[in-house]
Amino acid sequence: MSLELLSKLETKIQAALETIELLKMELEEEKQTSSSLSEQNQQLQQELTSWNEKVTGLVGLLNEEVN
């Protein structure tokens, strides 16, 4: 191989490595976002369960008053 071809190959390899590093950083950001959204989802599900229990209790009280 000529030095020119080796230089081009080195440039392409360097660009590929930089792309891989950028993709790794993006993946880490996405993992953090996913984790945060998962925690938020769990909290919202707990709040929904709590509200459903409260509403069920209030409906039960209303039914007792009506009967």
UniProtKB/Swiss-Prot annotation:
It holds the Pfam family ZapB. Homodimer. The ends of the coiled-coil dimer bind to each other, forming polymers. Interacts with FtsZ. It is found in: Cytoplasm. The lineage of its organism: Bacteria, Pseudomonadati, Pseudomonadota, Gammaproteobacteria, Alteromonadales. This is Cell division protein ZapB. Belongs to the ZapB family. It comes from the Bacteria. Its main location: cytoplasm. The gene is zapB. Residues 3-59 form a coiled coil. Non-essential, abundant cell division factor that is required for proper Z-ring formation. It is recruited early to the divisome by direct interaction with FtsZ, stimulating Z-ring assembly and thereby promoting cell division earlier in the cell cycle. Its recruitment to the Z-ring requires functional FtsA or ZipA. Signal peptide: none annotated. Keywords: Cell cycle, Cell division, Coiled coil, Cytoplasm, Septation. One of its GO terms (cellular component) is cytoplasm. One of its GO terms (biological process) is division septum assembly. It comes from Shewanella halifaxensis (strain HAW-EB4).
